[in-house]
Amino acid sequence: VPMPELPGLSALLVQGGDERIALQGESGQNKYGVSPAPRAGLVEFSSSTASHISAEAWAAVDAFRQRMHEERSDGPEHERALWQREARRIRTTFCTTWGLEAAQMSWHLHRSGTDAHAMASALSLRKFGRPYRIVMGEACETGSKVAQALLEGSRQQGRLMAELSEIAIRGEDGACRSAQAIDQDFLRVVTQSLAEDVPVMVVRVDESKSGCCYPSQALVQQIAAGSPQHTSVLVDCSQLRCEAQVLQDYLARQYLVVLTGSKFYGAPAFCGALLGGADWAAVWPQDLPDVDAHGRPNFGVLARWEAALCAMQRYQQLPDEVRHEWLACFEEALTQRVAASSSLSLLDALRDGRSGPRSLFALRCRDSGGQRSLSPAEVERVYRRLNQMQPQQAQEYVYAIGQPVPCMGADGQRSQYLRLSLSAPMLLMLAQMPQAQGRAWLRARIDGVVGGLEEEIALLGQSDR
C-alpha cells in the first residue's frame, strides 16, 4: 500500500500539535493569532509568545518537505527510519551551531516545551527511584501547562510520585521580590526536603515570561554540588535568549535543559527539545520517532525544527558585536519611548547578574491618566484590538505583541502585563540594513507599536468602533 502523501506545507507545520496551534475557522490562525505561513506587512514584537514564520524559514521547510516527499517509500519501517535519520541530522546541526559536543549530550525532540518538562520530571524519577519534590518559581511566570506537566511526568502506575512547591517571584505590587529572598525560599524548601530524605528537582528559569532569571546560578550550583545523588536541576530555557556559552555551561554541569525554537528564533509553535549532559545517558530512554494515533511518524515537528535552525544558524554566525549592537538599540529605543508614556511602564525583571542588553520586556498598563492599573479584561481587550488590526485600519504597519500575563498592579489591583520582544529573524533583517537606516526603522516601529497601545488604552470605555 503506498504511503499517504505528506500534508501541504501549512498543514505540515501544524502537524502533531494540540488545540493551541489548531487552525480556527475561517481565520486560518491558531489561538495565538498566528497562521502557519509568512505574513507580509506585519511587524512582530511577539516572539515571547509566537511569530509567523519568516520567508527564509518557509523556503527551508519547503525544501525539507520536497526532500522527504522524494525519499519516502512504501512501508512504515522505512518511514520511521527516515524520521530518525532526519532527527539525528537536526541534532548534529544544532550541536554544531551552538558549539556543543553531540557525543557528550543526550537529546530528545518534543512537540512542545511542555512535553519536554514532563520528560525531565520522568528522568528525575528514574534517577531517584522514589517520591521526590519539585521546587519551582510561581507558575504564571512560565508556560501555562508546565506545572501540571512536571507532576504528570512523575506518574508511575497511576500515582503521582512528585509534590510541587512554588516560590513567589513577585510581590503584592507586581514588582520582583529580591533575588536574595527568592534564593532563601528555594534553599529553605530544598534543605527541608533533603533533611526528610526526599530528593529534590530544582527548576531554574532562564528567561521567564517577563524576562526574569531565577533562582541564581550560584544557588543552583551550591544545591547540585551539595547533594548530587539526591538532586537534579532542570533549566527552563524555553525562550532560548541566552548566549551559546550559557547553554554549554548548563550541559557541562549535567543539568537538564528544556528549550524551544518557536520563541526567539521564530519557528512555528510546538518546536521543543530536552537536552541533558552525559551523566543522564544511563536513564535516557531510547529515542523513538514521535508518532500519531496511527503509528505514523510526525514529520511536523521536524519541519518546525528545520525552520528554527534556519534562523539559529544565521544568528549564531553574526559577530557578537553586531548582535549586541541591535539588542542595545532595541532596549534603548523601547525604554526611552515607554518612559515618555503616561499609560505604560516597564515591569522590573531579575537578571541574575547579566549586564547585556535585553530582548524581552514586560509592560504594565494603566489608564490614560495614569491613575489606576487596567483590569485583566481591559488589558485583554487592548491586546486583542492591537493584534487583530487589519492593514486598512493602520497608517502603514500592523503590529503583533506577546500575550497578556496575570500580574498584580503597582496599586495592588489585579492586572496583566503585555510583552514586547525582539526576535532573531527581526535582528537578522536589521543587520542587513545600513546602520542608520536600521536604527531609524526600529525606532519608528517601536514608536508605532507603543503609540498603538496608548491609543487602544485611550479608547477603553468608549463605544466599539
PLM segments and residue spans:
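Active-site C-terminal subdomain of aminotransferase-like
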Residues: 262-357, 460
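Intrinsically disordered, low-structural-confidence terminal and linker regions
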Residues: 1-31, 394, 398-400, 409-415, ...
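Conserved PLP-enzyme active-site core in the AAT-like
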Residues: 108-298
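Conserved small-domain helix->loop->beta segment predominantly found in fold-type I
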Residues: 315-326, 330-415, 464-465
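Low-complexity, highly charged intrinsically disordered N-terminal segments
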Residues: 40-80, 84, 136, 162-197
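Extended charged low-complexity segments that act as oligomerization/scaffolding linkers
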Residues: 2-17, 67-76, 142-169, 282-295, ...
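PLP-dependent enzyme catalytic core of the Aspartate aminotransferase-like
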Residues: 1, 407-465
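Conserved N-terminal alpha-helix of the aminotransferase class I/II PLP-enzyme fold
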Residues: 5-24, 31, 57-115, 123-130, ...
